[in-house]
Curated annotation (Swiss-Prot):
Function field: Required for optimal transformation.
Gene Ontology terms: cellular component: cytoplasm
Hydrolase is among the record's keywords: no
Record-given protein name: Competence protein CoiA
InterPro entries according to UniProt: CoiA_nuc (IPR010330), Competence-induced_CoiA (IPR021176)
Highest rank taxon of the organism: Bacteria
Keywords of this entry: Competence, Cytoplasm
Main location: cytoplasm
């Protein structure tokens, strides 16, 4: 098979004949100045796999990944055609006795296409390893990134719920792990930059990152929330804002510290962290105000009710176990900080008053003390 990776303006290539490995049709060599070198079918005949021109950024990234996998003794094959599933991954490699289909994705891809390609590889016993082009990533603050539905496809497909990016210009991987949403499209992440010459394929693809969170960055996000005007809120956010004002006479900027807990499993929620935790906080403090026991089963049921009523949105379909873990991690944190006290297994009481803070400075100090590292 012949590839145009690294091809220059060479007229000799144009005099040679090339044929598509999939349909057998004759190909033309395109060596223009505007686009990266690529093949195109000479005639408008249907082909099972379209040969589309790729950006120079994408081609260079793919070339570097291929060369790197060769140094890793992973026996890489560039763009092999897998006839049984009619797919052609960017690179196929063998790492730790596993066959990997490395897909370097720089362009937007529809969710159904992403899912089909992922499931196709799995069907053949091949592990899909998606790597996003670094150019598609936007950093919004220290340790915070803008992550859309496009990005979450990659995260959800990863066994470690992480996002691996590669930049051919910097020749480095960027590994985002332990991703915790603050807003719907604005998430905290532990970040690791790994130059490609120092990266080990086994460690990068088959080792779970160690848990880590910089609370200082999370606290700054809370402070930005408290000082920004809240003019364009979603319906669910507005419902919560009205409830806090009606039930607690609490302005939105004065939401309690306890509704901003960075829960590792919180990525199951599409709603902002203060929304899903805010509804549960009101339920628990209502019970606490009546000196009634707060049962985990009741809090979980309340969460499901709010999901059903569209007050809380899930990012995607999730099992009851995932939802239960997220709610349990939230309650465990509140116990750790002394807000709740467990009296018997999964039964709690409110350990301290829910209100009492009216100064913004006092509230900011409370944020800092709660999330001190």
């Amino acid at each position: 098979m012949f590839h145009l990776l690294g091809a220059q303006q060479n007229q000799k290539l144009k005099r040679r004949r090339f044929f598509c490995p999939v349909c057998g049709g004759e190909l033309a060599v395109k060596l223009g100045l505007q686009k990266a070198p690529h093949f195109a079918h000479k005639q408008n005949k249907s082909c099972a796999i379209d040969i589309e021109p790729e950006s120079a950024y994408h081609l260079e990234g793919k070339r570097q990944l291929y060369v790197w996998l060769k140094t890793q003794r992973a026996s890489p094959i560039l763009e092999p055609y897998i006839r049984t599933i009619n797919q052609r991954p960017d690179v196929m490699a063998r790492i730790k006795e596993h066959m990997l289909a490395v897909e370097y994705q720089c362009a937007t891809i529809a969710p159904d296409v992403f899912q089909k390609r992922t499931e196709g590889f799995k069907q053949e016993g091949i592990i899909p390893q998606w790597i996003m082009g670094y150019s598609r990533l936007k950093r919004t603050a220290s340790s915070f990134y803008q992550l859309s539905t496009f990005h979450w496809q990659f995260i959800n497909a990863s066994p470690y719920r992480e996002l691996i990016c590669y930049c051919p210009e910097r020749r480095s991987f960027l590994r985002l792990s332990h991703i915790i949403p603050f807003y719907t499209n604005h998430s905290y992440s532990s970040v690791q930059t790994i130059p490609i010459h120092r990266a080990g394929a086994g460690d990068l693809f088959f080792t779970e990152p160690k848990p880590s969170i910089q609370y200082s960055g999370w606290t700054k996000a809370i402070h930005r929330f408290r000082h920004k005007p809240h003019r364009f809120n979603s319906k669910e956010t507005n419902r919560l804002r009205l409830l806090f004002y009606e039930k607690r006479q609490t302005p939105f900027s004065f939401l309690p510290t306890e509704v901003f807990v960075p829960v590792r499993k919180g990525a199951v929620f599409k709603s902002p962290v203060f929304v899903w935790q805010g509804f549960l906080y009101l339920f628990m403090t209502d019970l606490g105000g009546k000196r009634a026991p707060i049962r985990f089963s009741a809090v979980l049921q309340q969460c499901k009710l709010h999901i059903h009523n569209k007050n809380i949105a899930l990012r995607s379909e999730c099992s009851e176990e995932c939802l239960s873990e997220a709610v349990k991690q939230y309650i465990d944190f509140l116990c750790k900080k002394g807000f709740l006290r467990e009296t018997q297994k999964e039964v709690y009481v409110l350990n301290q008053p829910a209100g009492g803070i009216h100064s913004m400075q006092d509230l900011i100090e409370r944020d800092r003390s709660c999330f001190i590292e």
